[in-house]
């Protein structure tokens, strides 16, 4: 014997089921809201990866463990138009200096492991050129060594100079290219723009390739001070960080 259910009955039955399910869901207690800096920076980690470890595609860089002063300066640069990325500007525009510093200090405090460097396809000759520029600079082009400001171990110098290791080659290439083309700026005197202007495209590729392939040291924490400059080193004065001591003033 077949039971027959009218369309009206079916509709009422479906509504009763829906109401019952809704009541069941609403009866489940909501998780308590945690107003923490980790929760408030979810908009950051959505792109920059959990805990600011960096996105897997290499487009969004690591935030975790970078010097607080550097992160703060970059947040200001995005908010105030010295760096250009629409989404970042929109997120930061309504935020105060004090809140940006709180964000910077939070990410700076995170000590999470770096991924292993990606093997490079760059030629040995290109890598040698990159190593020389990073470690020694090029006096003929008046280019200082990268380690002069970014630290002997290239892990950065507190409070305002970032590390250069653990970053993808494409990201490094893009940022150096942005300095060279004038798309990226810092507080005057804009030392990075002046340095990169003296590098050709091959130099930029060499530096990015060598840094991206270089293994990280055991300690990735920023150095407390920049290394002493050797005699004849090219002096650098940066608006976003305290001026480095010139070689002539060293003993």
Task: Enumerate the language-model features and the residues they cover.
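N-terminal secretory signal peptides that target proteins for export/translocation
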Residues: 1-9
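Bacterial N-terminal signal peptides
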Residues: 10-24
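Sec/Tat signal peptide C-region and signal peptidase I cleavage site
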Residues: 24-30
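Flexible coil segments in periplasmic/lumen-exposed cytochrome c-class electron-transfer proteins
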Residues: 30-41, 50, 86-93, 97-155, ...
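The feature marks the first
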Residues: 32-81, 85
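His/Cys-centered metal/cofactor-coordination and adjacent catalytic loops
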Residues: 53, 112, 164
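Short, recurring structural edge motifs at helix starts
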Residues: 57-61, 89-92, 159-161, 194
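Extracellular/lumenal glycan-associated surfaces
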Residues: 65-68, 74, 162, 167-168, ...
């Amino acid at each position: 014997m077949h039971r027959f259910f009218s369309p009206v009955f079916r509709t009422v039955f479906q509504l009763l089921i829906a109401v019952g399910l809704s009541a069941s869901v609403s009866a489940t207690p909501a998780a308590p809201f945690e107003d923490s800096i980790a929760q408030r920076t979810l908009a950051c980690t959505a792109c920059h990866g959990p805990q600011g470890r960096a996105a897997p595609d290499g487009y969004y860089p690591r935030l975790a463990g970078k010097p607080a002063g550097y992160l703060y300066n970059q947040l200001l640069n995005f908010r105030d138009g010295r760096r250009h990325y629409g989404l970042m500007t929109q997120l930061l525009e309504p935020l105060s200096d004090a809140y940006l510093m709180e964000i910077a200090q939070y990410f700076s405090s995170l000590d999470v492991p770096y991924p292993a460097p990606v093997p490079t396809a760059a030629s040995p000759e290109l890598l040698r050129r990159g190593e020389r520029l990073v470690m020694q600079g090029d006096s003929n082009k008046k280019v200082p060594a990268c380690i002069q400001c970014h630290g002997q171990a290239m892990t950065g110098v507190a409070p305002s100079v970032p590390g250069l290791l653990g970053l993808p080659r494409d990201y490094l290439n893009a940022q150096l290219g942005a300095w060279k083309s004038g798309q990226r700026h810092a507080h005057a005197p804009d030392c990075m723009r002046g340095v990169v202007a003296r590098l050709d495209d091959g130099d930029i590729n060499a530096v990015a390739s060598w840094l991206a392939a270089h293994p990280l040291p055991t300690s990735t924490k920023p150095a407390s001070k920049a290394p002493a400059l050797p005699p004849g080193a090219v002096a650098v004065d940066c608006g976003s960080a305290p001026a480095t001591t010139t070689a002539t003033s060293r003993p």
